[in-house]
Amino acid sequence: MKLFGLIGEKLGHSLSPEIHNKVFKDNNIDGLYNLFSVKKDFENNIVESLKCLGVKGANVTIPYKEKVMDQLDIISHEAKAIGAVNTILIKDGKSYGYNTDYYGFGKMLERAKVNIEGNSFFVLGAGGAARSILKYLEDSKAKKIVLVSRDREKAFKKFKDFNINFMSYGELEEINEEFALINTTPCGMYPNINSVAVSEKVIKKFKVAVDIVYNPLETKFLKMAKDNGLKTVDGLFMLVGQGVKAEEIWNGIKVDKSTEEDIYEELKCRF
């Protein structure tokens, strides 16, 4: 039996086991997916512990996505650029780090038939969640990428390695029509379901609204967007997509789209 798992500090409500167990079942993989709650006292020994336990692959969540990078032998190009690893592969005694949030975001937009190349994207929020999204948009040849944050100067210092523009929320109110608006802030996430990062006036200026929040599935931001005729994309498929990509890395397989859809539909019932 192959051993896999999720590494983090507080893991009680993780949906990851459901994603991975479905992939195991559909691909006849004799696998076990565990939750590994790691105290901060042991954060410097994560990779060695995985090797000792015989773990083949692991997902990594907060607060260890950055901390684990120094412990890895090889880090993928996207994880280096993003500055965070959320997937580890142990193979032939070596450890490899990837960022599958990057791929999960791409899978989410591809499924929703949102074209990136040649279009403009405005990203709300300058937290860690924005990094994989900005990198994917950059690599996919978006015409214009704008990071919107409360502190423009602070955001510039934090994201200066990206080929993007910067804007404050006040400046966002004055823009003309653009293509897509992406929320990477926790606004609208349960239990704060009535919060939204931008006004309806701003939302109306876009054709597409994307929210990486998935609890609730339809946030207030997406509800406002839908009511104003925008195409809307919820964040649940990004979660599914990043998990599926991890499985493809660990097991050298290509997961069928039917499996991805089944996982999405099963998880959708939870919200």
From Swiss-Prot:
It comes from the Bacteria. It is an enzyme of class 1 (oxidoreductase). CDD domains: NAD_bind_Shikimate_DH (cd01065). One of its GO terms (molecular function) is NADP binding. Keywords: Amino-acid biosynthesis, Aromatic amino acid biosynthesis, NADP, Oxidoreductase. GO terms for cellular component: cytosol. NADP(+) binds at residues 125-129, 212, 235. One of its GO terms (biological process) is amino acid biosynthetic process. InterPro entries: Aminoacid_DH-like_N_sf, NAD(P)-bd_dom_sf, Shikimate_DH, Shikimate_DH-bd_N, Shikimate_DH_fam, Shikm_DH/Glu-tRNA_Rdtase. Its EC number is 1.1.1.25. Shikimate binds at residues 14-16, 61, 86, 101, 214. Involved in the biosynthesis of the chorismate, which leads to the biosynthesis of aromatic amino acids. Catalyzes the reversible NADPH linked reduction of 3-dehydroshikimate (DHSA) to yield shikimate (SA). The active site is at 65 (proton acceptor). The lineage of its organism: Bacteria, Bacillati, Bacillota, Clostridia, Eubacteriales. This is Shikimate dehydrogenase (NADP(+)). The keyword Oxidoreductase applies.
